[in-house]
């Protein structure tokens, strides 16, 4: 889910800004796999929300953090970082795996939430799964072509659809519709029938 959440917005040459406080698997995804795909991840100390702003440039597509990072369990400043990002056209993607019952990041301004079903639902690593939730609270169109080109320019892989325009009649769901119609199609993940 974390990979899809980022890949839905960032391509080679783009970057995201991430908290340094991450689960080891996510850290390696960001430091190695995304790097190999040409997506730079800029790690910042999350105790100062301004660090996210200071690491941002014209190619920054998202901020990423964990609500209660594993193993530190320190509380991430969701509202502060979400506000910084929103003013710059950058969504905050939150991994809420450790606190699904305790915290509702969308209510604090996060735009996208991811969960590791492997950890929370399975618990022993015998199942693999992830979940992405689009909060429907981020104005992707207002973020614009320069900040969010993946959703504001024609997608040649889907008949030239401009996602923010294509889904307007059904609501602010361009982010999740693009994930379902492109990443699920291309990378072989399967949605549960239930």
Enumerate the language-model features and the residues they cover.
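Conserved PLP-enzyme active-site core in the AAT-like
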Residues: 1-194
């Amino acid at each position: 889910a974390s990979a899809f959440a980022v890949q839905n917005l960032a391509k080679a040459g783009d970057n995201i800004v991430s908290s340094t406080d991450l689960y080891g698997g996510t850290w390696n995804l960001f430091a190695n796999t995304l790097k190999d795909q040409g997506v730079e991840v800029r790690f910042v100390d999350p105790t100062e929300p301004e660090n996210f702003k200071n690491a941002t440039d014209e190619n920054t597509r998202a901020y990423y953090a964990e609500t209660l990072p594993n193993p530190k369990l320190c509380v991430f400043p969701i509202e502060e970082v979400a506000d910084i990002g929103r003013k710059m056209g950058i969504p905050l993607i939150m991994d809420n795996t450790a606190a699904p019952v305790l915290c509702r990041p969308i209510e604090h301004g996060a735009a996208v939430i991811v969960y590791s079903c492997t950890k929370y639902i399975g618990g022993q690593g015998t199942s693999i799964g992830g979940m992405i939730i689009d909060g429907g609270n981020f104005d992707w169109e207002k973020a614009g072509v320069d900040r969010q080109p993946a959703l504001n320019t024609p997608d040649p892989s889907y008949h030239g659809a401009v996602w923010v325009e294509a889904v307007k009649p059904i609501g602010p769901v361009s982010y999740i519709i693009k994930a379902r119609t492109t990443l699920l199609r291309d990378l072989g993940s399967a949605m549960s029938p239930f």
